[in-house]
Amino acid sequence: MAMSKIATLAGLLASAGLVAGHGYVTKMTIDGEEYGGWLADSYYYMDSPPDNYGWSTTVTDNGFVSPDAFGTDDITCHRGATPGALSAPVTAGSKIDITWNTWPESHKDNQGPIINYLAKCNGDCSSADKTSLEFVKIQAEAIVDASTNTWVTDELIENSFTTSVTIPASIAPGNYVLRHEIIALHSAGQQNGAQAYPQCLNLVVSGSGTDNPSGTPGTQLYSANDEGIVFDIYSNPTSYPMPGPELYSG
């Protein structure tokens, strides 16, 4: 094959890698009970998709939100998101396992932080207005072991595309949206290259906590130029500047 054709093919493959999507959340598991998420590549095409706990989206391509859309509602719960009809019960202090349909197993294509937020619905989450939700960062993980270049997303893959988040024991009871997100960094070394995959699920939190921390609107969580949004993952980093508001320490 002529060198010009090889170069053209390589360029096309690289471009495909930049736009290809990664995945979505299929379910959460709480105390052994499974609660279904929005199956984006099938429910979207149904006239009457089943009620579920995940917010519906118009994302049929395992797609992402790019940094140039971080100031829009797309970043809140993904593109075209509307509230799920159901809410899963969880006790503050408990762990939630979250399972994705897939995530790229090519080492660099999968790496990035996993960040979790809570936003109080101030009513039933099935009628929540995403523009009024204010998110509190409750868990954020990135590099697990710099010596082996292991990220939390590597562990996600090793654990059958499942990760976990613990609801803080100090959080007051109520109806909440859990915003669970992976930010893929394989193209983040260039402007507008990071890929955000926000997923929202409804919870009813019980317990004896009393904290009602103030949060941040989805459209103000990140900016396109933040450290951690523009980031060279190929430089063998030993640390990662977590984007977004400060972590809740309650």
Curated annotation (Swiss-Prot):
Assigned protein family: Belongs to the glycosyl hydrolase 61 family.
Binding site for O2: D51, H186, Q195
Lineage: Eukaryota, Fungi, Dikarya, Ascomycota, Pezizomycotina
Protein name (database record): AA9 family lytic polysaccharide monooxygenase F
CC cofactor: Cu(2+)
Disulfide bonds, paired cysteine numbers: C77-C200, C121-C125
Keyword list, A-Z: Carbohydrate metabolism, Cellulose degradation, Copper, Disulfide bond, Glycosidase, Hydrolase, Metal-binding, Polysaccharide degradation, Secreted, Signal
Species annotation: Emericella nidulans (strain FGSC A4 / ATCC 38163 / CBS 112.46 / NRRL 194 / M139) (Aspergillus nidulans)
Subcellular location: Secreted
Phenotype seen when the gene is deleted: Results in about 25% reduction in fungal growth on sugarcane straw but not on Avicel. Results in 60% reduction in activity using phosphoric acid-swollen cellulose (PASC) as the substrate.
Documented applications: Lignocellulose is the most abundant polymeric composite on Earth and is a recalcitrant but promising renewable substrate for industrial biotechnology applications. Together with cellobiose dehydrogenases (CDHs) an enzymatic system capable of oxidative cellulose cleavage is formed, which increases the efficiency of cellulases and put LPMOs at focus of biofuel research.
EC number: 3.2.1.4
CDD domains: LPMO_AA9
Cofactor binding notes: Binds 1 copper ion per subunit.
Signal peptide interval: 1-21
Any single biological process term in GO: cellulose catabolic process
Induction statement: Expression is induced by cellulose and xyloglucan. Expression is also slightly induced by chitin, a main component of fungal cell walls with a structure closely related to cellulose. The promoter contains two consensus sequences for xlnR binding sites (5'-GGCTAA/G-3'). The degenerate binding motif 5'-SYGGRG-3' that binds to creA involved in carbon catabolite repression is also present in the promoter.
EC class (word): hydrolase
Record-level GO cellular component terms: extracellular region
GO terms for MF: hydrolase activity, acting on glycosyl bonds; metal ion binding
The keyword Metal-binding is assigned to this record: yes
